[in-house]
Amino acid sequence: EFALRHGQKPERIGLLTTGSSLLKVALHPAAAKLREAVAAIIANSLTWIDVQSLTDPINFYGSDPKKALGITAGKGPRIVRVRFRKQLGKSTYRSIKYNFFRVHRQFVYAAERRTGYSFHAILCGPQPLSEIAANGGLARRWPARKAPEGQHP
């Protein structure tokens, strides 16, 4: 909302929310300004991806932030569901799956396997957020170029 008020073009702005964490704050009665900001984001049709995981008991899995906040006009977020089990090796997944806080943080941790969701690839990679949202996740083969020998992509 700040960027819009300061002249940024809507097509150059995007929002990535993880674990439906926005709702943890926005549903509080005192969060009127946050709800107004979310309504402005929706009204301006900004690209917005909300990532959720069934494995995470702390997130609002299955929710639609736009509907949950009672916003009727505009386009809500593209909801992307991620399976941490597919992102992690068996031993890593086994070691974290009962640690609720560690599972919740997995949204922003590096993935051990390529999937359609990688926090770091979405924020720092070459693929535009609008393209990621349209496809429901990262391109199947990212990065587009091959990494030099001995380096991980």
Question: What annotation goes with each model-predicted range?
Answer:
Residues 14, 20-153:
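Lipolytic serine-hydrolase domain surface
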Residues 1-5, 27:
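Conserved catalytic block of serine-dependent lipid acyl chemistry
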